[in-house]
Amino acid sequence: MPQIILNARNLGSGNKTALLAVPWLGMLTSLLGNLSLLSYFAKKKEKEAMVVQTLGVVSTYVVIVQLALAEAMPLSYFLATSVVVVSGLVLNFLNYFGLLNAGIWRFWEDFITVGGLSVLPQIMWSTFVPYIPNSILPGATAFLIAVVAVTMSRSGKLSEKGVKFVGGISGWTATLLFMWMPVSQMWTNFLNPENMKGLSAFSMLLAMLGNGLMLPRALLIRDFMWFTGSAWATFFYGYGNIACLYFLNVISKEFFLAATVGLISWIGLAFWRDSVVHGHSSPLASLRDLVFGS
Protein backbone atom coordinates (compact mmCIF):
# COMPACT_ATOMS: atom_id res chain seq x y z
CA MET A 1 0.00 0.00 0.00
CA PRO A 2 2.77 2.58 0.76
CA GLN A 3 4.26 1.96 -2.71
CA ILE A 4 0.83 2.45 -4.28
CA ILE A 5 0.34 5.71 -2.38
CA LEU A 6 3.83 6.95 -3.34
CA ASN A 7 3.19 6.06 -7.00
CA ALA A 8 -0.17 7.86 -6.89
CA ARG A 9 1.50 11.00 -5.52
CA ASN A 10 4.16 10.92 -8.23
CA LEU A 11 1.54 10.37 -10.93
CA GLY A 12 -0.57 13.20 -9.53
CA SER A 13 2.39 15.58 -9.61
CA GLY A 14 3.33 14.51 -13.14
CA ASN A 15 6.57 12.88 -11.99
CA LYS A 16 6.33 9.74 -14.13
CA THR A 17 10.11 9.22 -14.07
CA ALA A 18 9.97 8.31 -10.37
CA LEU A 19 7.96 5.20 -11.23
CA LEU A 20 10.92 3.84 -13.18
CA ALA A 21 12.34 2.85 -9.77
CA VAL A 22 9.79 0.01 -9.90
CA PRO A 23 10.70 -2.39 -12.77
CA TRP A 24 7.61 -3.59 -14.62
CA LEU A 25 9.28 -6.91 -15.44
CA GLY A 26 9.86 -7.49 -11.75
CA MET A 27 6.24 -6.64 -10.94
CA LEU A 28 5.05 -8.94 -13.73
CA THR A 29 7.06 -11.89 -12.44
CA SER A 30 5.75 -11.25 -8.93
CA LEU A 31 2.17 -11.04 -10.20
CA LEU A 32 2.38 -14.24 -12.22
CA GLY A 33 4.18 -15.98 -9.37
CA ASN A 34 1.51 -14.95 -6.87
CA LEU A 35 -1.25 -16.04 -9.25
CA SER A 36 0.34 -19.45 -9.79
CA LEU A 37 0.95 -19.89 -6.05
CA LEU A 38 -2.70 -18.98 -5.48
CA SER A 39 -3.63 -21.97 -7.66
CA TYR A 40 -1.19 -24.14 -5.71
CA PHE A 41 -2.70 -23.20 -2.35
CA ALA A 42 -6.28 -23.32 -3.67
CA LYS A 43 -5.70 -26.94 -4.65
CA LYS A 44 -4.26 -27.67 -1.17
CA LYS A 45 -7.17 -25.78 0.49
CA GLU A 46 -4.74 -23.57 2.45
CA LYS A 47 -7.21 -20.77 3.20
CA GLU A 48 -4.82 -18.36 4.95
CA ALA A 49 -2.17 -18.73 2.26
CA MET A 50 -4.83 -18.13 -0.40
CA VAL A 51 -5.81 -14.86 1.25
CA VAL A 52 -2.17 -13.71 1.34
CA GLN A 53 -1.59 -14.63 -2.32
CA THR A 54 -4.83 -12.93 -3.38
CA LEU A 55 -3.79 -9.74 -1.62
CA GLY A 56 -0.43 -10.05 -3.36
CA VAL A 57 -2.08 -10.42 -6.77
CA VAL A 58 -4.44 -7.47 -6.26
CA SER A 59 -1.84 -5.08 -4.80
CA THR A 60 0.77 -5.96 -7.43
CA TYR A 61 -1.81 -5.52 -10.19
CA VAL A 62 -2.62 -2.03 -8.87
CA VAL A 63 1.09 -1.14 -9.12
CA ILE A 64 1.14 -2.51 -12.68
CA VAL A 65 -1.87 -0.31 -13.54
CA GLN A 66 0.08 2.68 -12.23
CA LEU A 67 3.15 1.71 -14.28
CA ALA A 68 0.96 1.44 -17.39
CA LEU A 69 -0.50 4.90 -16.70
CA ALA A 70 3.04 6.25 -16.35
CA GLU A 71 3.91 4.60 -19.70
CA ALA A 72 6.58 2.59 -17.88
CA MET A 73 5.01 -0.66 -19.12
CA PRO A 74 4.01 -1.48 -22.73
CA LEU A 75 0.23 -1.34 -23.23
CA SER A 76 0.04 -4.71 -24.99
CA TYR A 77 1.71 -6.48 -22.04
CA PHE A 78 -0.62 -4.69 -19.63
CA LEU A 79 -3.77 -5.77 -21.50
CA ALA A 80 -2.63 -9.40 -21.73
CA THR A 81 -1.73 -9.38 -18.04
CA SER A 82 -5.15 -7.98 -17.12
CA VAL A 83 -6.97 -10.80 -18.92
CA VAL A 84 -4.86 -13.47 -17.20
CA VAL A 85 -5.27 -11.90 -13.74
CA VAL A 86 -9.06 -11.60 -13.92
CA SER A 87 -9.44 -15.12 -15.34
CA GLY A 88 -7.08 -16.58 -12.75
CA LEU A 89 -8.82 -15.00 -9.76
CA VAL A 90 -12.26 -16.13 -10.92
CA LEU A 91 -11.17 -19.70 -11.69
CA ASN A 92 -9.24 -20.14 -8.45
CA PHE A 93 -12.09 -19.09 -6.22
CA LEU A 94 -14.67 -21.06 -8.19
CA ASN A 95 -12.47 -24.12 -7.74
CA TYR A 96 -11.95 -23.47 -4.02
CA PHE A 97 -15.71 -23.38 -3.43
CA GLY A 98 -16.29 -26.46 -5.59
CA LEU A 99 -18.11 -24.60 -8.36
CA LEU A 100 -15.69 -25.31 -11.20
CA ASN A 101 -15.74 -28.18 -13.65
CA ALA A 102 -12.74 -30.51 -13.16
CA GLY A 103 -11.87 -30.33 -16.86
CA ILE A 104 -11.68 -26.53 -16.79
CA TRP A 105 -9.43 -26.67 -13.73
CA ARG A 106 -7.11 -29.16 -15.43
CA PHE A 107 -6.93 -26.81 -18.43
CA TRP A 108 -6.03 -23.92 -16.10
CA GLU A 109 -3.32 -26.02 -14.43
CA ASP A 110 -1.88 -26.89 -17.84
CA PHE A 111 -2.09 -23.22 -18.85
CA ILE A 112 -0.14 -21.97 -15.83
CA THR A 113 2.39 -24.79 -16.25
CA VAL A 114 3.05 -23.94 -19.90
CA GLY A 115 2.71 -20.20 -19.37
CA GLY A 116 4.91 -20.07 -16.28
CA LEU A 117 7.63 -22.24 -17.78
CA SER A 118 7.61 -20.09 -20.94
CA VAL A 119 7.53 -16.71 -19.23
CA LEU A 120 10.20 -17.42 -16.60
CA PRO A 121 13.27 -17.82 -18.87
CA GLN A 122 12.04 -15.04 -21.17
CA ILE A 123 11.69 -12.54 -18.33
CA MET A 124 15.03 -13.61 -16.85
CA TRP A 125 16.65 -12.95 -20.23
CA SER A 126 14.81 -9.67 -20.87
CA THR A 127 15.84 -8.25 -17.49
CA PHE A 128 19.42 -7.82 -18.74
CA VAL A 129 18.63 -6.36 -22.18
CA PRO A 130 20.36 -4.30 -23.71
CA TYR A 131 23.48 -5.78 -22.06
CA ILE A 132 22.60 -9.00 -23.86
CA PRO A 133 20.88 -9.31 -27.28
CA ASN A 134 17.09 -8.98 -27.33
CA SER A 135 15.68 -12.41 -28.20
CA ILE A 136 12.52 -14.51 -27.83
CA LEU A 137 14.51 -17.75 -28.09
CA PRO A 138 14.51 -18.54 -24.32
CA GLY A 139 10.74 -18.22 -24.05
CA ALA A 140 10.03 -20.01 -27.33
CA THR A 141 12.28 -22.93 -26.43
CA ALA A 142 10.75 -23.28 -22.97
CA PHE A 143 7.26 -23.07 -24.48
CA LEU A 144 7.90 -26.01 -26.80
CA ILE A 145 9.39 -28.09 -23.98
CA ALA A 146 6.45 -27.30 -21.70
CA VAL A 147 3.83 -28.16 -24.35
CA VAL A 148 5.51 -31.50 -25.09
CA ALA A 149 5.80 -32.34 -21.37
CA VAL A 150 2.16 -31.49 -20.59
CA THR A 151 0.88 -33.32 -23.68
CA MET A 152 2.84 -36.47 -22.82
CA SER A 153 1.65 -36.29 -19.22
CA ARG A 154 -2.03 -35.97 -20.16
CA SER A 155 -1.81 -38.69 -22.82
CA GLY A 156 -0.34 -41.23 -20.39
CA LYS A 157 3.04 -41.50 -22.12
CA LEU A 158 5.04 -40.73 -19.00
CA SER A 159 5.85 -42.91 -16.01
CA GLU A 160 4.24 -42.23 -12.65
CA LYS A 161 7.34 -40.32 -11.55
CA GLY A 162 7.26 -38.33 -14.80
CA VAL A 163 3.62 -37.37 -14.29
CA LYS A 164 4.38 -36.32 -10.71
CA PHE A 165 7.34 -34.25 -11.91
CA VAL A 166 5.28 -32.43 -14.55
CA GLY A 167 2.54 -31.85 -11.98
CA GLY A 168 5.03 -30.14 -9.68
CA ILE A 169 6.47 -27.88 -12.37
CA SER A 170 3.80 -25.19 -12.00
CA GLY A 171 4.41 -24.85 -8.25
CA TRP A 172 8.18 -24.54 -8.58
CA THR A 173 7.84 -22.25 -11.61
CA ALA A 174 5.53 -20.02 -9.59
CA THR A 175 8.08 -19.92 -6.78
CA LEU A 176 10.91 -19.07 -9.18
CA LEU A 177 8.81 -16.33 -10.82
CA PHE A 178 8.11 -14.91 -7.39
CA MET A 179 11.81 -15.18 -6.52
CA TRP A 180 12.93 -13.35 -9.67
CA MET A 181 11.24 -10.09 -8.65
CA PRO A 182 13.96 -9.24 -6.08
CA VAL A 183 16.65 -9.91 -8.70
CA SER A 184 14.94 -7.56 -11.15
CA GLN A 185 14.54 -4.90 -8.45
CA MET A 186 18.19 -5.18 -7.36
CA TRP A 187 19.33 -4.90 -10.98
CA THR A 188 17.22 -1.76 -11.39
CA ASN A 189 18.71 -0.36 -8.17
CA PHE A 190 22.20 -1.00 -9.53
CA LEU A 191 21.50 0.64 -12.89
CA ASN A 192 19.52 3.63 -11.59
CA PRO A 193 20.41 4.35 -7.95
CA GLU A 194 19.19 7.93 -8.37
CA ASN A 195 15.62 6.62 -8.75
CA MET A 196 15.66 4.80 -5.40
CA LYS A 197 13.68 7.61 -3.79
CA GLY A 198 10.74 6.37 -5.84
CA LEU A 199 10.84 3.10 -3.88
CA SER A 200 8.81 3.04 -0.66
CA ALA A 201 10.77 1.86 2.39
CA PHE A 202 7.53 0.97 4.17
CA SER A 203 6.46 -1.21 1.23
CA MET A 204 9.74 -3.09 1.50
CA LEU A 205 9.23 -3.42 5.26
CA LEU A 206 5.73 -4.81 4.71
CA ALA A 207 7.10 -7.20 2.08
CA MET A 208 9.65 -8.44 4.60
CA LEU A 209 7.05 -8.78 7.34
CA GLY A 210 4.35 -10.34 5.17
CA ASN A 211 6.61 -13.01 3.71
CA GLY A 212 8.33 -13.54 7.04
CA LEU A 213 5.00 -14.31 8.71
CA MET A 214 4.49 -17.19 6.25
CA LEU A 215 7.73 -18.91 7.26
CA PRO A 216 6.55 -20.60 10.50
CA ARG A 217 3.56 -22.22 8.75
CA ALA A 218 5.66 -23.42 5.81
CA LEU A 219 8.23 -24.77 8.27
CA LEU A 220 5.59 -26.48 10.42
CA ILE A 221 4.06 -28.46 7.53
CA ARG A 222 7.49 -29.05 5.94
CA ASP A 223 6.56 -27.39 2.63
CA PHE A 224 10.04 -26.74 1.22
CA MET A 225 8.77 -24.95 -1.90
CA TRP A 226 6.61 -22.54 0.11
CA PHE A 227 9.43 -21.92 2.60
CA THR A 228 11.96 -21.27 -0.18
CA GLY A 229 9.79 -18.67 -1.90
CA SER A 230 8.84 -16.89 1.32
CA ALA A 231 12.40 -16.88 2.67
CA TRP A 232 13.80 -15.54 -0.59
CA ALA A 233 11.24 -12.73 -0.71
CA THR A 234 11.82 -11.94 2.97
CA PHE A 235 15.60 -11.65 2.69
CA PHE A 236 16.20 -10.47 -0.88
CA TYR A 237 13.12 -8.42 -1.73
CA GLY A 238 12.09 -6.96 1.61
CA TYR A 239 15.31 -6.80 3.62
CA GLY A 240 17.57 -6.57 0.55
CA ASN A 241 15.89 -3.41 -0.68
CA ILE A 242 15.84 -1.95 2.82
CA ALA A 243 19.62 -2.47 2.86
CA CYS A 244 19.92 -0.75 -0.55
CA LEU A 245 17.87 2.20 0.69
CA TYR A 246 20.08 2.47 3.78
CA PHE A 247 23.39 2.36 1.91
CA LEU A 248 22.10 5.03 -0.49
CA ASN A 249 21.14 7.21 2.52
CA VAL A 250 17.41 7.12 1.75
CA ILE A 251 16.42 5.72 5.18
CA SER A 252 17.85 6.22 8.66
CA LYS A 253 20.30 3.98 10.48
CA GLU A 254 17.67 3.33 13.17
CA PHE A 255 15.15 2.07 10.59
CA PHE A 256 17.72 -0.30 9.10
CA LEU A 257 18.91 -1.63 12.47
CA ALA A 258 15.34 -2.17 13.69
CA ALA A 259 14.53 -4.16 10.54
CA THR A 260 17.73 -6.21 10.92
CA VAL A 261 17.19 -7.08 14.58
CA GLY A 262 13.51 -7.81 14.01
CA LEU A 263 14.20 -10.17 11.10
CA ILE A 264 16.95 -12.12 12.88
CA SER A 265 14.82 -12.43 16.02
CA TRP A 266 11.77 -13.66 14.09
CA ILE A 267 13.71 -16.30 12.14
CA GLY A 268 15.35 -17.53 15.33
CA LEU A 269 12.00 -17.66 17.15
CA ALA A 270 10.35 -19.57 14.28
CA PHE A 271 12.99 -22.30 14.23
CA TRP A 272 13.14 -22.51 18.02
CA ARG A 273 9.36 -22.92 18.40
CA ASP A 274 9.27 -25.46 15.57
CA SER A 275 11.97 -27.54 17.24
CA VAL A 276 9.93 -27.50 20.47
CA VAL A 277 6.72 -28.56 18.69
CA HIS A 278 8.46 -31.45 16.92
CA GLY A 279 10.49 -32.49 19.97
CA HIS A 280 13.90 -31.72 18.48
CA SER A 281 16.88 -30.81 20.63
CA SER A 282 18.16 -28.27 18.08
CA PRO A 283 16.54 -25.83 15.62
CA LEU A 284 18.95 -27.20 13.00
CA ALA A 285 17.01 -30.46 13.13
CA SER A 286 13.93 -28.60 11.88
CA LEU A 287 15.95 -27.24 8.96
CA ARG A 288 17.21 -30.75 8.18
CA ASP A 289 13.66 -32.13 8.18
CA LEU A 290 12.50 -29.31 5.92
CA VAL A 291 15.19 -29.90 3.30
CA PHE A 292 15.65 -33.67 3.43
CA GLY A 293 12.42 -34.86 5.03
CA SER A 294 11.88 -36.31 8.48
Task: Report residues per predicted region.
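Alpha-helical membrane-protein topology signature
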Residues: M1-S294
